């Protein structure tokens, strides 16, 4: 029996919608990354994008456990000497809801052109509404522990 290798034009991609309300950032991000990569499918092939489209709603209601709201730091640099900027999770969630989830998922995907193609299949929205009703996304219940 020959080993099966998926071709990019043969892959069937489904659309799923995930509600991030009261979900923990890291646990949610790891499951989304797994689905974007396609590791849940039997036809998974490491060098082919076999993943599904994921629409995340209520990203502004996502949480972290413990003191990570204040302790978790995000860094960026302007490119100029001394141009480093630092912010924490709470400030980032208030200003850019969903960016923390995007950074977390992006770090869990492969680096390079394949990873860039995978991250484009994730759509994040702060509220409950999204413009992807025409794709008829199926609700995906990710059973992660909610913050207590």
UniProtKB/Swiss-Prot annotation:
Entry's Gene Ontology cellular component terms? cytosolic large ribosomal subunit
Query: Which InterPro entries does this entry report, sorted A to Z?
Result: Ribosomal_uL13, Ribosomal_uL13_bac-type, Ribosomal_uL13_sf
Keyword Aminoacyl-tRNA synthetase assigned: no
Task: List the GO molecular function terms.
Answer: mRNA binding; structural constituent of ribosome
Does GTP-binding count among this protein's keywords?
no
User: What keywords sit in the KW lines?
Assistant: Ribonucleoprotein, Ribosomal protein
The alphabetized list of GO BP terms reads:
negative regulation of translation; translation
In Pfam terms, one family for this protein is: Ribosomal_L13
- Which family does the record claim for this protein? Belongs to the universal ribosomal protein uL13 family.
Q: How does it assemble?
A: Part of the 50S ribosomal subunit.
PANTHER family given for it?
A: LARGE RIBOSOMAL SUBUNIT PROTEIN UL13M (PTHR11545:SF2), RIBOSOMAL PROTEIN L13 (PTHR11545)
Q: Outline what the protein does.
A: This protein is one of the early assembly proteins of the 50S ribosomal subunit, although it is not seen to bind rRNA by itself. It is important during the early stages of 50S assembly.
Q: Which named protein is this?
A: Large ribosomal subunit protein uL13
Natural source organism? Thiobacillus denitrificans (strain ATCC 25259 / T1)
């Amino acid at each position: 029996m020959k080993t099966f290798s998926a071709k990019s034009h043969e892959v069937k991609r489904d659309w799923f919608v995930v509600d991030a309300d009261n979900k923990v950032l890291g646990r949610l991000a790891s499951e989304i990354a797994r689905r974007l990569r396609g590791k849940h499918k039997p036809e998974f092939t490491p060098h082919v994008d076999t993943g599904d489209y994921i629409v995340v709603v209520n990203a502004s209601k996502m949480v972290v456990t413990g003191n990570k709201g204040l302790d978790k730091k995000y860094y960026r640099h302007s490119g100029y000497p001394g141009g480093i900027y630092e912010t924490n999770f709470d400030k980032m969630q208030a200003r850019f809801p969903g960016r923390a989830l995007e950074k977390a998922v992006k770090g869990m995907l492969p680096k390079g052109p394949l990873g860039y193609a995978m991250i484009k299949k994730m759509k994040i929205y702060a509220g409950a509404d999204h413009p992807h009703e025409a794709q008829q996304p199926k609700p995906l219940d990710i059973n992660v522990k909610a913050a207590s």
